[in-house]
Amino acid sequence: SIKALLERRIDGIIFIGDNSDIPLIQSIAAQSIPIVTGDRKVGNIPSVTFNNKETVQEMVDSLYKSGCRKFMYVGETPTGQSNLLNRYNGYTDALKKYSDTTSVIFLEESLHGDKLKTARRLFTKKIITSLPDVIITSNDLIAQGIISAAHENGINIPNDMQITGFDDSLSSAYFIPSVTTVSQNIDELAKRCFSMLMNLINKKSAVSSIIEQNIISRSSAKINI
């Protein structure tokens, strides 16, 4: 455990976790132990993050230009997680520009757990009663769950409704239909986090940085980038 590591007087920590760990991160930083967070920001702690907000805005803009007018966002509740919050804000901010669109937002706490099962429940329990032109999700597993349930209910993806994921999981390229998603350079994230931590350990400055992401257009939604 992290507490056991701290007892061994480690030189520093690179932390990639969820919002439940924020108090622990803040506690470690308060002890003046060098710490870097990856894929999320926690206060003023040095971090390496992705441009989540801008990427979702770009996705929404492209889908609007292709003719989509009824949008839906399905994702985990973003409370306390900067990466999820930025994806959500990218969606809402992008749609503010377009007065002729409608938007439905479905945030579900249980999506933090079994994303695939919870996403399928949106259709099996008829939570989604009116099909949007496109559903933008915060995670590939959520997108896959909705696609699976839609298929069982006779809904064709992407002809009846388009859907996008986020994080380019290994199965998304082979899912039927393949999932339009966002690719994150995890290797670059790791390299920058390590370099930043070494700077902190050596009493040098550590400047937070943001990594750009790539939208991967596949069969579930056509995005022209």
Please state what every model-predicted region is.
Residues 11, 68-71, 133:
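Short acidic/polar active-site loop segments enriched in Thr and Asp
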Residues 123-225:
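Flexible loop/turn connectors
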Residues 48-58, 74-96, 101-122, 136-144, ...:
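Hinge/beta->alpha junction and helix N-cap segments in small-molecule ligand-binding domains
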Residues 29, 96, 151:
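Anion (oxyanion) recognition and catalysis
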Residues 70, 101-104, 157-162:
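Short acidic capping loops at alpha-helix termini that bridge into adjacent secondary structure
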Residues 1-61, 127-128:
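Alpha-helical recognition/docking segments in bacterial nutrient-uptake
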Residues 60-70, 213:
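Nucleotide donor/acceptor-binding cores
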